[in-house]
Regions:
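Bacterial Sec-dependent N-terminal signal peptides
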Residues: 1-22, 654-655
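Beta-solenoid repeat scaffold
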Residues: 23, 52-98, 114-127, 153-167
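Acidic Gly/Asp/Thr-rich repetitive segments characteristic of extracellular carbohydrate-active
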Residues: 28-63, 67, 502, 540, ...
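Acidic glycine-/aspartate-rich tracts in secreted/extracellular proteins
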Residues: 29-34, 65-67, 78, 90-93, ...
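C-terminal outer-membrane/trafficking sorting elements
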Residues: 569-656
Length: 656
């Protein structure tokens, strides 16, 4: 309890400083560096504020609507009780701070804002850019950052950073990369790794640690490679890691590579984010390759309640993947759709990598013919467990991987139909209680199958359609069905939601013995205070508690009639939703009075609303509504009832 209170106190301190000290105002349009820095007489340049020593409780204000070009080097630290705050004043658009297109001479800077060996600070309501086009003598050509926080001294710990309501966009190095420029995949990989470009970077030299970071309610777009990059330069054998990172309620749109990349972190929580088109290639400079999230040499990484749409790229580019040598990675309650690489990717050297209660729709459509470098038959996967780590020819199989209670659907047809590979090279892998569904000419596991785990435990999975027979036969207690999913014959809903007679209800194996839930190490950090050690609900918040006969798949609903609930008054207003999985319209039962309705996305934004008359039992989805996770709210004059739904408007396209 004391640990939880301490973390909550830090969050509270982000909202206000207990003892505000100096206030500095800057305006690039009306300021002058000879002014006194007050709101009435603001300074003008980043150089002026860079040469000002800041202390605990200080606040730096940038004028909204202004653009500040150059290099802001933060000089000074706050304390845990009195943070330094960087924010805005006035009206209009967020102030822009850019390290490029300035008149300082000497070329574009490596980053717009640099924090070196300073800590205890808040960045709130700023827009950060850094599109480098002019070389600088002390900066590599393939490097660019928006904000860089760094420890460059051994055994120095930096604490308490908050980034909220921020925008990171238009961050590029001098040059780009295109797969067509290479004829060797290894040379391409080296070139890819050489790009150090991100909107927000945390870097620790050997022996240094950055601790207690929150990035929330922020927007990332038009970035050449990475949204947020956390790095620690400690040796592989070292136990030094950056600690306690939280990324929540952020939106990432058209990022050239990965959205969130934790490298050598311990305790990282990534939740309630929208990842839309990672691995984008909207211009020649963009990298064009990336899973939304992947981790490397990290401990205790929880990735939950996110949505990933349309990840692309020549390699990786799954929705969320587990890279090399991690311990306790939990990927749960996420929705992934149209991700080019596939669904599950667990590379070598991991312990307890877990995919559970996720929904995957049309993931794994990559074709090797789309890339001149790629000539391997398993380039796209439904499940991929690799036993290799980068830089080693030895086998490093991952131990105790769990893949359970996921719903996996591939239903593209015609020229868009595709099949996937399944490769399992691990130790003590468990695959149970999953739905694998393929139809319309698409398939799962027929492209290639490699199964190299003598201790593979696979049971109580449901198979429908064109699924590899080899994969099916590995299941000791499989459920084979023809379609028993709701509304397939009608065609106005997605065909992969269970209905009353579905054979997936109560058909799963119990969570006991070899199939017991792996525990999340929630006591390892305060950031996990609201994370459950063991799951008690399914993807749609249906209860799992005490269930000795769970369903197969991501939904544990026991009937077709799924009630919208008021959690504090669960017996009122018995309105039912026919289907959690929606493509064109929401079908309801029991609408015996009028309601206002709203569809709210995972960032809390109302994306569609209207009026539902009594006895009208359908809501037509707006064409502009994108795929993802929503909460449906029905409200009358006294009460509000809700249900979680998934909207699947597949935007499958193999072309950028």
């Amino acid at each position: 309890m004391r640990r939880q209170i301490k973390f909550q106190l830090f969050v509270l301190l982000l909202s206000f400083s207990l003892c505000a000290q100096n206030q500095y105002y800057l305006s690039s349009s009306t300021g002058n560096d000879n002014n006194d820095g007050s709101q009435a007489q603001p300074w003008k340049t980043l150089s002026k504020i860079s040469n000002t020593s800041l202390g605990p409780g200080d606040t730096v204000y940038f004028k909204k609507g202004d653009t500040f070009r150059g290099h802001f080097v933060v000089d000074g630290s706050g304390t845990e009780e009195n943070l330094i705050t960087f924010t805005s004043y006035g009206s209009g658009n967020q102030p822009i701070i850019s390290g490029s297109d300035h008149d300082d001479g000497g070329g574009d800077y490596r980053e717009a804002i640099l924090v070196t060996n300073h800590d205890n600070m808040v960045f709130d309501g700023l827009e950060i850019q850094n599109h480098r086009t002019i070389p600088r003598s002390d900066v590599g050509d393939l490097v660019s950052f928006g904000i860089r926080v760094e420890v460059i001294s051994s055994n120095v710990n930096l604490n308490n950073f908050s980034f909220r309501n921020m925008t990171f966009k238009n961050v590029y190095a001098l040059f780009g990369i295109n797969t067509s420029d290479y004829t060797d995949i290894n040379i391409y990989q080296q070139a890819f790794n050489a790009f150090e470009v991100s909107g927000l970077t945390f870097f620790s030299s050997d022996g240094g640690i950055i601790n207690n970071v929150i990035v929330e309610d922020s927007y990332f777009t038009d970035l050449q490679r990475i949204g947020v990059h956390v790095k620690n330069a400690a040796a592989k054998t070292s136990d030094k890691r950056n600690t306690n990172f939280v990324f929540r309620n952020n939106e990432f749109f058209q990022i050239g590579g990965t959205c969130v990349l934790p490298v050598r972190t311990e305790n990282c929580l990534i939740e309630n984010n929208i990842f839309n088109q990672p691995g984008a290639k909207t211009n020649d400079k963009m990298i064009g390759r990336g899973s939304a999230v992947w981790n490397w040499f990290s401990i205790n990484t929880i990735v939950q309640y996110n949505q990933v749409i349309n990840a692309k790229g020549i390699m990786d580019s799954h929705g969320i993947h587990v890279d090399h040598s991690n311990v306790d990675t939990f990927i749960q309650y996420n929705y992934m759709q149209d991700c080019e690489g596939g669904f599950v990717e667990i590379l070598g050297g991991n312990q307890r990598a877990v995919y559970r209660f996720n929904i995957s729709v049309n993931d794994g459509w990559r074709h090797q013919d789309n890339y001149n470098l790629l000539r391997w038959p398993n380039s796209d996967h439904t499940i991929w467990l690799n036993n290799k780590v980068w830089g080693s020819e030895e086998d490093h199989p991952s131990h105790d991987s769990y893949i359970y209670n996921n719903t996996v659907v591939i239903n593209k047809s015609g020229n868009e139909a595709f099949d996937t590979a399944i490769d399992i090279k691990g130790k003590n892998t468990r695959i149970f209680n999953n739905i694998f569904y393929a139809n319309n000419g698409s398939g799962i596991g027929n492209q290639q199958g490699n199964y190299n785990d003598p201790n593979l435990l696979m049971t109580n999975n449901l198979f429908h359609g064109n699924i590899s027979n080899h994969f099916r036969n590995l299941d000791s207690n499989r459920v084979d069905i023809n379609s028993d999913f709701s509304n397939e014959e009608i065609g106005y809903q997605n065909e992969f939601q269970i209905n009353l007679s579905s054979q997936s209800i109560n058909a799963g194996t119990a969570y006991a013995g070899d199939y017991a839930h792996p525990a999340i190490p929630v006591n390892a950090s305060d950031i996990f205070a609201n994370v459950e050690e063991y799951p008690t609900v399914d993807f749609f918040s249906n209860s799992l508690s005490g269930d000795s006969t769970p369903n197969i798949g991501a939904s544990n609903a026991k009937s077709r009639e799924i009630k919208l609930l008021n959690k504090t008054k669960p017996t009122i207003n018995k309105v039912y939703i026919q289907n959690h999985m929606i493509s064109e319209k929401v079908i309801l039962y029991g609408v015996n009075k009028s309601y206002t309705y709203a569809l709210v996305d995972i960032l809390g934004r109302t994306k569609q609303s209207g009026f539902l008359e009594a006895n009208k039992e359908e809501i037509i989805l707006d064409e502009s509504l994108i795929s993802g996770i929503y909460v449906l709210k029905l409200s009358d004059q006294t009460n509000t009832i809700t249900s979680k739904i998934v909207v699947n408007k597949s935007s499958f396209s193999p072309d950028y």
